[in-house]
């Protein structure tokens, strides 16, 4: 089973100078604290968010999984 690579997502977001608030808005989430729960592993990213996340982070979907 594939797992979301949370370390990669956080690292890549920071490399691109994207804030958690910006990620939340781009993904259609209600708040940056909501996004924070996903990035810290307290909530699971849903499959439908992954294509948009790959686009925002300028990477392939495969990079988002371990």
Tell me what each language-model feature is:
Residues 48-63:
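DNA major-groove recognition helix of helix-turn-helix/homeodomain DNA-binding modules
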Residues 13, 24, 54:
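The alpha-helix within a helix-turn-helix
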Residues 26, 63-66:
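Short amphipathic recognition helices of helix-turn-helix/homeodomain-type DNA-binding modules
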Residues 1-15:
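A short, Lys/Arg-rich alpha-helix, primarily the initiator
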Residues 17-37:
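Short alpha-helical DNA-recognition segment
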Residues 10, 21, 51:
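Residues within the helices of the helix-turn-helix
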């Amino acid at each position: 089973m594939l797992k979301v690579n949370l370390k990669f997502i956080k690292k890549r977001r920071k490399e691109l100078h994207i804030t958690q608030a910006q990620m939340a808005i781009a993904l259609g989430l209600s708040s940056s604290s909501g996004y924070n729960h996903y990035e810290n592993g307290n909530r699971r990213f849903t499959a439908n968010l992954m294509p948009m996340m790959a686009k925002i982070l300028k990477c392939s979907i495969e990079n988002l999984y371990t």
